[in-house]
UniProtKB/Swiss-Prot annotation:
E.C. code: 3.5.4.5
Organism, as annotated: Salmonella arizonae (strain ATCC BAA-731 / CDC346-86 / RSK2980)
Gene designation: cdd
Name of the protein: Cytidine deaminase
Organism phylogeny: Bacteria, Pseudomonadati, Pseudomonadota, Gammaproteobacteria, Enterobacterales
Summary of subunit composition and partner proteins: Homodimer.
Free-text function comment from the UniProt entry: This enzyme scavenges exogenous and endogenous cytidine and 2'-deoxycytidine for UMP synthesis.
Keywords: Hydrolase, Metal-binding, Zinc
GO BP annotations, alphabetical order: cytidine deamination
Keyword Metal-binding: yes
Amino acid sequence: MHPRFQTAFAQLADNLQSALAPILADHHFPAMLAAEQVSTLKNATGLDEDALAFALLPLAAACARTDLSHFNVGAIARGVSGNWYFGANMEFLGATMQQTVHAEQSAISHAWLCGEKGLAAVTVNYTPCGHCRQFMNELNSGLDLRIHLPGRAPHTLRDYLPDAFGPKDLEIKTLLMDEQDHGFALTGDTLTQAAITAANKSHMPYSQSPSGVALECKDGRIFTGSYAENAAFNPTLPPLQGALNLLSLNGYDYPDIQRAILAEKGDAALIQWDATAATLKALGCHNIDRVLLG
């Protein structure tokens, strides 16, 4: 078990501990539960889905990287597939506050980058900030997405974001988590192709500026992130954050990164290179390359 889970795990009910122990045994537990595992945990504990999600929130929050705020937020995105995806907030010392990943963004990006096609609900241990409410409004689940908070009845995003502004106001039809493939040819080595594949998945209807990042760890594991734009612009999630989020959720740390590649168009309206390189260098990675899409 990864050390970050030990304190939260010890506070769980005995029957939940027993059912979770074999799942968490892997140091690189991917911070997600397949639908079959969710069913196993429900049967072992007698908890319904909502109660189980609340019980697991401390494990999600244990994934937080909060060197600045020391305020851990955990979220669980429940996919329409039945799979559950953990998320937690991330802060990056030496970078800028704008690079921060919120817990809801973390869980949603986690689900999206794992191939989930839509979300049924998000469970979170603190009320979503305005930034996250706007981020969630980009999803193909729309304002019907259910949000679950401890001690409160479940509500929809519509309740938390009244008079919402979103992609439909800008006549955008393809939404975040809809399947997209921008068709850029795969070239180069495995890591380069992974970055291009991530760029092909980008949700960028406002700038038409696709981008993707691939991070290679010292053990050969590769994590990718795709660019996810938002109708309100500022809640947009850069591709590097998506990749770093997956890396961290899978139990890796920044010193494990040995190489990084950004894929983007050289003449795009928005360029990720400077911000990507600056953040990676702040985290100790200097082996950074850029491949141009075309």
